[in-house]
Amino acid sequence: MQTEDSQKVVRRFFEALQVLKRERIIRGKQTFTARYGINRWNLNTLEKEPSRDIFQPAWLSYLVKDYGVSATWLLTGQGEPLKWLTDKKESASP
């Protein structure tokens, strides 16, 4: 059983995946799971049940290293999930 803080990290992980999908950086969870050899069934189960003990910390590192997701945001919820994306949108605004 995951702690409440661990479940929050898991929820932010899935939120980051949704942002990446919405911004067309990834096509979806299948793209992510195939790239890193993650069992898609486990990922789908975890999304529905964040308290399950199947989350792998390496999944966070993939988001941080390969997609620029904020490690601080993933772990604490503070700041922006994708600061580079926020900065890009702000600079494009008139």
Predicted regions and their residues:
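Short, charged recognition helix plus adjacent turn
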Residues: 1-8, 75-94
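Hydrophobic/aromatic-rich, well-ordered segments within soluble, folded domains that form packed cores
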Residues: 69-71, 75
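Residues that mark the N-terminal boundary/hinge immediately upstream of a DNA-recognition element
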Residues: 27-28, 59, 70
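A short, Lys/Arg-rich alpha-helix, primarily the initiator
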Residues: 1-34
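Recognition helix of helix-turn-helix/homeodomain-like DNA-binding domains
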Residues: 37-55
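Short, basic-rich loop-to-helix N-cap that marks the start of a DNA-contacting helix
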Residues: 49-65, 81
